[in-house]
UniProtKB/Swiss-Prot annotation:
Transmembrane segments: none annotated. This is Aspartate--tRNA ligase, cytoplasmic 1. It catalyses: tRNA(Asp) + L-aspartate + ATP = L-aspartyl-tRNA(Asp) + AMP + diphosphate. Its EC number is 6.1.1.12. It comes from the Eukaryota. L-aspartate binds at residues 302, 346, 502, 506.
């Protein structure tokens, strides 16, 4: 059969429509997917020009975060020994221009100039230098921003090239050079400072003037006749007058570790160290032996109540008021010339500008052949050699102190002017002022200062000696004057009208010593060992004790002994 079998139209039509519908949906779905892909590709292609730069910057930032020339170093626990060549800020001079140096210092200040430049002041003790961090080469923008955000007083390691400056950098000690930084790392990061170093470093004359101006305005405000507008104007002037933070002495001492970072204060203690060094050098050169006496003793070393009492196991002990008795025991042991640098304790409730309950004593004792003035000559020679040494070896430190605390240069001559107590009292009496008539056989503080001014006017010096004091105002071991038992072979040394040393010929006869001790109220049993040491023969001897902090205070004209004490102790302060 050649004919085809007919297919029912209805059945064939229904099947064809369903298949077409499914195929249509499939095609539409595929089309949407294709369009979405095309759109995404088109957007990606259209944005390729701008997004390329953004991606590059992002990648660059990621690289910079891992940069090897800036950041914060891990804590140094001495894991390994590394040999590197370091340069002190003080060594940065024009002789190093063009050379690469490695510096460790404190970040004193930082100043961002836009996004790509930062100026930093680095401080190392007394010395400061400017460092510049600029974008370029291996220095990234992130590095510049990082340096600009390093907290003040952080300790940093800086690798840099020394370059000369066309204009002196007046804000730094190293004025003729600066550093072009190539690496910058934090060694020890500082937290928020309770006091700013800038405030602690402020020149005293600026603070004094501000205080004077404020007092004057305050006095004007006390006028009850002022109208409201006048009061408002004065209050405004008072507010405008306050330009500087005036940090009190108490706040400085409460934050002593920060206060001592100030260059002027660093210099004070370098000078203090210098006084000890010069004291030791001079006496060693004259044949003295350095000794170290005990500070916990069984009895008060001086008469009086100014002694710290301690519980010592099952008995009582005292803190030594001086090494006096032990210096003399050394003389009895034929040491002949001895000195000591050590702590001295005085339980005196004296809240003055020149008293401390603990200070450093510079003591000496020596035998003499004919007259106690041999010892006085030694003291004169010693002190003037110290003054001379400070001038020649510590000029930079003196200049640094003078910048913050201006003072007149210390004047002295050798031999120094000497006066008896009566001669000095007569100079004061010439003023015809009842306040300067010497009573009680000794000078008071006001009389001492006035005497210093008189001698400065007449002799042009700040250092002088007064000899032959009344025996009743000297310790029990002081030798009386054989020509007049009311006087003593005793002397004081003065700087700028304040006593810095008391000394005398000592009693070396045990019977006279015991008699004198009894007359001064000393319990003989407590010092029997001391008295007995003179029973086996003892050379005549003399000496003195100098207060270290007082010497530094007066030489630099500081006005308060607490500035010359590392961590001062007075009746109200036991910390830090």
């Amino acid at each position: 059969m050649s004919e085809t079998t007919p297919v029912p139209v209805g059945e064939a039509g229904e099947k064809s429509a369903t298949a077409l519908k499914k195929e249509q949906k499939k095609l539409e779905k595929e089309k949407k997917i294709a369009e979405a892909k095309a759109k995404k590709a088109a957007e990606k292609s259209a944005a390729s020009g701008n997004s390329g730069e953004q991606k590059n910057e992002k990648k660059q930032e990621q690289v910079e975060e891992n940069n090897s020339n800036w950041g914060e170093l891990p804590m140094n626990q001495s894991k390994e020994k590394i040999t590197r060549e370091w340069t002190d800020v003080s060594q940065l001079t024009e002789s190093l221009v063009g050379k690469s140096v490695l510096i460790r210092a404190r970040l004193s200040t930082s100043r961002l100039q836009g996004a790509n430049l930062c100026f930093v002041q680095l401080r190392d003790g007394l010395y400061t230098v400017q460092a510049v961090v600029a974008k370029g080469g291996s220095n990234s923008k992130s590095m510049v921003q990082f340096v600009g955000q390093v907290p003040k007083e952080s300790i940093v390691d800086v690798q840099a090239t020394v370059v000369s400056t066309s204009v002196p950098i007046e804000s730094c000690t190293q004025k003729s050079v600066e550093l072009q930084v190539s690496s910058f790392f934090i060694v020890s990061k500082s937290t928020l400072l309770p006091l700013q170093i800038e405030d602690l470093s402020r020149a005293q004359p600026l603070l004094d003037k501000q205080e004077d101006d404020l007092k004057q305005l305050e006095q004007l405000l006390q006028n009850t006749n002022l109208n409201e507008q006048e009061k408002t104007d004065l209050e405004k002037k008072k507010s405008e007058c306050i330009k500087f933070v005036n940090v009190s002495q108490e706040k400085r001492l409460d934050n002593r570790a920060l206060d001592l970072r100030v260059p002027a204060h660093q210099s004070i203690f370098r000078l203090q160290s210098g006084v000890c060094t010069l004291f030791r050098e001079q006496l060693l050169g004259e044949g003295f032996i350095e000794i170290h006496s005990p500070k916990i003793i069984s009895a008060a070393s001086e008469s009086g109540a100014s002694v710290f009492k301690l519980n010592y196991f099952n008995t009582h002990a005292y803190l030594a008021q001086s090494p006096q008795l032990y210096k003399q025991m050394a003389i009895c042991a034929d040491f002949n010339k001895v000195f000591e640098i050590g702590p001295v304790f005085r339980a005196e409730n004296s809240n003055t500008h020149r008293h401390l309950t603990e200070f450093v004593g510079l003591d000496l004792e020596m035998t003499f052949k004919d007259h106690y003035h041999e010892a006085l000559d030694t003291l004169d020679r010693l002190m003037t050699s110290i003054f001379r040494g400070l001038e020649t070896r510590f000029a930079k430190e003196i200049e640094s102190v003078n910048t913050q605390y201006p003072f007149e240069p210390f004047k002295f001559t050798y031999p120094s002017p000497r006066f008896t107590f009566d001669e000095a009292a007569a100079m004061l009496a010439e003023l015809n002022d009842p306040d300067y008539i010497v009573k009680d056989n000794d000078f008071n503080t006001r009389q001492e200062k006035r005497l210093g001014k008189i001698i400065k006017e007449k002799f042009g010096v700040d250092f002088f000696i007064v000899d032959k004091f009344h025996v009743e105002v000297r310790p029990f071991y002081t030798m009386p004057d054989p020509n007049n038992p009311q006087w003593a072979n005793a002397y004081d040394l003065f700087m700028r009208g304040e006593e810095i040393c008391s000394g005398a010929q000592r009693i070396h006869d045990p019977e006279l010593l015991e008699k004198s001790a009894k007359s001064h109220g000393v319990v003989i049993e407590d010092i029997q060992g001391y008295i007995d040491s003179f029973k086996y023969g003892c050379s005549q001897h003399a000496g003195g004790g100098v207060g270290l902090e007082r010497v530094v205070m007066l030489y630099l004209g500081l006005g308060n002994i607490r500035k010359a004490s590392f961590c001062p102790r007075d009746p109200t302060r036991l910390t830090p």
